[in-house]
Amino acid sequence: MGVYRVCVSTGASIYAGSKNKVELWLVGQHGEVELGSCLRPTRNKEEEFKVNVSKYLGSLLFVRLRKKHFLKEDAWFCNWISVQALGAAEDKYWFPCYRWVVGDGVQSLPVGTGCTTVGDPQGLFQKHREQELEERRKLYQWGSWKEGLILNVAGSKLTDLPVDERFLEDKKIDFEASLAWGLAELALKNSLNILAPWKTLDDFNRIFWCGRSKLARRVRDSWQEDSLFGYQFLNGANPMLLRRSVQLPARLVFPPGMEELQAQLEKELKAGTLFEADFALLDNIKANVILYCQQYLAAPLVMLKLQPDGKLMPMVIQLHLPKIGSSPPPLFLPTDPPMVWLLAKCWVRSSDFQVHELNSHLLRGHLMAEVFTVATMRCLPSIHPVFKLIVPHLRYTLEINVRARNGLVSDFGIFDQIMSTGGGGHVQLLQQAGAFLTYRSFCPPDDLADRGLLGVESSFYAQDALRLWEIISRYVQGIMGLYYKTDEAVRDDLELQSWCREITEIGLQGAQKQGFPTSLQSVAQACHFVTMCIFTCTGQHSSIHLGQLDWFTWVPNAPCTMRLPPPTTKDATLETVMATLPNLHQSSLQMSIVWQLGRDQPIMVPLGQHQEEYFSGPEPRAVLEKFREELAIMDKEIEVRNEKLDIPYEYLRPSIVENSVAI
């Protein structure tokens, strides 16, 4: 009984409004009332009206809605609905939606306070939870893009995706326009340079005139320097391979005459300043054939020393693993002739490009986030607090991944056209990399400790990753602490347990053998697991994604393919280097794709700045505000630090870390 003020918010995207009428019902603990056809929702507007209700409803539990269409279906994007009881109590209820309303079925929006099954002892929301998950499991089914990989969402086309997983119009227009621009630029570069010679390293400048960053220009000018080569293992686009050596690698076989090198390495090892980057993952991967021309791969090992000034300097490069019955592979040194040493470094940089794009970026960023997305939609109803906590960090992931499978890594896609791992090698590499998806490697406190990078003052990735993890962890603990007061509450939450099990056993194909949990036994363990999911979708992906434009635009620093075999002798010349590096077309296409993926995104939500409010009430809002305050402090401190650095490290700066895997 009484008067209610109802406010309905419609999204801002181009087609968010609807010409169809919307009917509403209020559902409370003690009754339900139909409000009738209340509005035709208008794009980017909050529409408010009052209703007089003759029934006593008690505390509101749901708003039900139905969109009625006459002749033409017109989808509506509903942000949220708020209902305020006018009178003595002035109770206000928040019903988040943030999805498309399609068809003429009745949809129920539960109140935004959120609860677990344990926190709903009367079972007021039980039927809704079960119905929602039943519908979602039909919409979100597991699929397998390639045998031997972790699972993905079923469906090979964008139209196979649930409508709520597709780009809104602004994002779609920007993405497709940038793709068209990149292809136009590629055609122009090819036509302008079709008759030009391709004989010196300076010739790469002829295609280096669009989409450059300040750091990319620095890379062009300094890429041959050993200090910049070493720096990239610490703070470049792929800081995930470097580890402190605890012994000399078994694969490092010293040919006769290399006793002095062995002594130098053992000296650095004893001092704790010896590091390694091992690309053994590339061993025995089948190399691509592009336009009937064989391409080539190596599996390098790089040994580096950390100097007192913080610089990481290469000491030796081995391009092949030793083979039984063969002579030890040559070891390339900084004292070798300049072109010999440069070619060895180019092989390392090309190998790093392959491993970056396939393992660090696609597998450990995009495909992992897809597993989290599908499992979340299948196992957690919208009223569940973990759903509310994690769903802003899953936005657009399914569409961007379907686009990647259809364009980048598809048959005859970009990888097949220009990458030395294309033509099937990329799938083989992903399959082999799956064995290294350990739980600890997704948690920076564990991963950095395992790799011996804690305390390395010149590893800004390590410092920033650890700090960002801790900030996200406190945020997760703050939200989870509102709903889980005891470890028993975690153990008894069957939806949470199902979600964890779905990720580990189904999505990740039995990853318990790599340390992923199949159940959550305490509040601390649950918080750690959720933090891992959010960090992977935000900070970790951004640390890998954002460096592409800076480090991969100058093609000799990250060759997409190599056109001659890895050297086995030390007689390389400039002609050898140019004949090995990508040709004009391959280089131009690499630059265009890197620009499209690495450019500043105009449609981008920074970490923690999502506008969607899935929680209602002051307590979750206070936790989110504290999270944003900590992110702002970190952002400012990184800005101050970077002013003193020769090369600023930006990739984990919260203001440019994206809130989800959306590009």
From Swiss-Prot:
PANTHER family: LIPOXYGENASE. Changing F353L: Changes the stereoselectivity of the oxygenation reaction to produce (12S)-HPETE instead of (15S)-HPETE. It is an enzyme of class 1 (oxidoreductase). Its cofactor is Fe cation. Keywords: Calcium, Cell membrane, Cytoplasm, Dioxygenase, Fatty acid metabolism, Iron, Lipid droplet, Lipid metabolism, Lipid-binding, Membrane, Metal-binding, Oxidoreductase. It holds the Pfam family PLAT. Its EC number is 1.13.11.31, 1.13.11.33, 1.13.11.-, 1.13.11.12. The gene is ALOX15. Residues 2-115 form the PLAT domain. The keyword Coiled coil does not apply. Residues 116-663 form the Lipoxygenase domain. Interacts with PEBP1; in response to IL13/interleukin-13, prevents the interaction of PEBP1 with RAF1 to activate the ERK signaling cascade. This is Polyunsaturated fatty acid lipoxygenase ALOX15. It catalyses: (5Z,8Z,11Z,14Z)-eicosatetraenoate + O2 = (12S)-hydroperoxy-(5Z,8Z,10E,14Z)-eicosatetraenoate; (5Z,8Z,11Z,14Z)-eicosatetraenoate + O2 = (15S)-hydroperoxy-(5Z,8Z,11Z,13E)-eicosatetraenoate; (9Z,12Z)-octadecadienoate + O2 = (13S)-hydroperoxy-(9Z,11E)-octadecadienoate; (5Z,8Z,11Z,14Z)-eicosatetraenoate + 2 O2 = (14R,15S)-dihydroperoxy-(5Z,8Z,10E,12E)-eicosatetraenoate. GO terms for molecular function: arachidonate 12(S)-lipoxygenase activity; arachidonate 15-lipoxygenase activity; iron ion binding; linoleate 13S-lipoxygenase activity; phosphatidylinositol-4,5-bisphosphate binding. InterPro entries: LipOase, LipOase_C, LipOase_C_sf, LipOase_CS, LipOase_Fe_BS, LipOase_mml, PLAT/LH2_dom, PLAT/LH2_dom_sf. Fe cation binds at H361, H366, H541, H545, I663. CDD domains: PLAT_LOX. PROSITE patterns: LIPOXYGENASE_1 (PS00711), LIPOXYGENASE_2 (PS00081), LIPOXYGENASE_3 (PS51393), PLAT (PS50095).
